[in-house]
Amino acid sequence: MKRKRLFLLASLLPMFALAGNKWNTTLPGGNMQFQGVIIAETCRIEAGDKQMTVNMGQISSNRFHAVGEDSAPVPFVIHLRECSTVVSERVGVAFHGVADGKNPDVLSVGEGPGIATNIGVALFDDEGNLVPINRPPANWKRLYSGSTSLHFIAKYRATGRRVTGGIANAQAWFSLTYQ
């Protein structure tokens, strides 16, 4: 019996002796990289121009007689404020959005019931040059200290032979590149 108690005590003693110890184990986990860019101060986009709506109006589908024919121009302006020419002297604008299936340079007005067909929205700079969507800026405008206004034109453009009536809304977002 004494032997059994001694054996039981000898087997339980190491567990009680180690119960208060905590063992920390450090294993290799991996590498981390932190990446980013700190940009110099550029222009501030006027608040109302960040969520702009350009009213294209109502246009008869009979007005379009050929592929590539445009509607009357609808001007719009992106206002830049608090610009510094110390950082950059020129700015380029790129427009991005869903391209029309027949003409990748213009914005799609969508598909489905009630949507106009064979029509897209084409964007132009203030000199009348087409600004193809989803491409880097091709035309650069001079920046002025303080405020700079960037003038553009939107036009409906026939992308097929027969334009049909319906909703003709397109959506785009723009990015600014400074040089």
Curated annotation (Swiss-Prot):
<dbReference type="GO" id="GO:0009297">
    <property type="term" value="P:pilus assembly"/>
</dbReference>
<dbReference type="InterPro" id="IPR036937">
    <property type="entry name" value="Adhesion_dom_fimbrial_sf"/>
</dbReference>
<dbReference type="GO" id="GO:0043709">
    <property type="term" value="P:cell adhesion involved in single-species biofilm formation"/>
</dbReference>
<keyword id="KW-0281">Fimbrium</keyword>
<keyword id="KW-1015">Disulfide bond</keyword>
<dbReference type="Pfam" id="PF00419">
    <property type="entry name" value="Fimbrial"/>
</dbReference>
<dbReference type="InterPro" id="IPR000259">
    <property type="entry name" value="Adhesion_dom_fimbrial"/>
</dbReference>
<dbReference type="GO" id="GO:0009289">
    <property type="term" value="C:pilus"/>
</dbReference>
<dbReference type="InterPro" id="IPR008966">
    <property type="entry name" value="Adhesion_dom_sf"/>
</dbReference>
<protein>
    <recommendedName>
        <fullName>Fimbrin-like protein FimI</fullName>
    </recommendedName>
</protein>
<feature type="disulfide bond">
    <location>
        <begin position="43"/>
        <end position="83"/>
    </location>
</feature>
<dbReference type="InterPro" id="IPR050263">
    <property type="entry name" value="Bact_Fimbrial_Adh_Pro"/>
</dbReference>
<keyword id="KW-0732">Signal</keyword>
<feature type="signal peptide">
    <location>
        <begin position="1"/>
        <end position="19"/>
    </location>
</feature>
<comment type="similarity">
    <text>Belongs to the fimbrial protein family.</text>
</comment>
